[in-house]
Amino acid sequence: MMATSIVGDILNSFILSGRLGYAEIFKSPVFWLCLILVVLAGLLAMPLAVPIGPMYWDTYIYLDATQRIKMGQIPGADFSTPVGPLGYYLFTAGLALFPKAQLLLLAQWSMLAAAAPLMAVVLGAIGPQRRALAFALLVPFLIFGIFPANVQAFHTYPGLDGFGIYNRQTSLLIYVLVSGLMFIREGRKLAVFCAIAKLCLFLTKITGFLVGGLIGLAALLAGRISVRSTILAAVLFLAVLAILELNGHMMTAYLADIARLVALNEEALLPRFLTVMSGKLDVILPSGLLVLAFSGST
């Protein structure tokens, strides 16, 4: 049903553009999204060489996971992984399609296979009447999705970052989720959209899933999504997890890995939290002051 909706949104966009003239096609944000995806696919088909920095352990983990998946092993059940299995399966499929692809770029861009269709739904929901708004959402999405670099610099060597891939992909999915909650009308379509977005977050990184849950709670309290749609999204989400569990107890193994990692890093959680808080103080402090000011004015 979601795939039909996505295809329908894209076709409706092009049909409407065709009626207005071929020049209108270039004004469609969905057209530019599809065009850039084609360009990225072309780049993956080429044997490119890019600097990935001295800290490239995440890129190596992708290669190890891909080799294990090709041997028939299941992430979580047969080998431990630091995050969810979605990124590894997308990378494995991408490597089969583009065997000459630059590995970091493939790892970074493979998540677009899940995020781009969801973003197309958001752009279709905005409609041609508000194209400026649609492009304002599309440009950051493409920047976050395409450029494999972290916000903070950990080394002085110029180049890209071969680590932190999961965090970048999680941020991209959260961006898509927030966009959908803001611009898709309340109803079944929004419920299915949220279920798929939350499923992608859960299967990518559990911390992103928790953040997405808080965002969903805020949307529920703000009236952007109804209780009925929330329940429908939760049912769809759990149904897919139940199906995935049949694949060698993948989900219970994934949750066991999460519990094991939390236990191993329990003593380091508070220092890491304080490190993140101090690193993002320029955002957290002004935001907190704005919340206090708004609360005081009301």
Segments the model singles out, each with a brief description of its role:
Residues 178, 190-206, 211-219, 237-241:
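Membrane-interface alpha helices of multi-pass inner-membrane proteins
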Residues 42-62, 68-70, 79-86, 102-106, ...:
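Transmembrane catalytic cores of multi-pass membrane glycosyltransferases
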Residues 97, 165-167, 200-207, 246-247:
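Transmembrane helix irregularities
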Residues 161-186, 191-193, 197:
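Specific aromatic-rich, kink-prone transmembrane helix
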Residues 87, 91-98, 104-119, 167-173:
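Transmembrane alpha-helices of multi-pass, membrane-embedded glycan-processing enzymes
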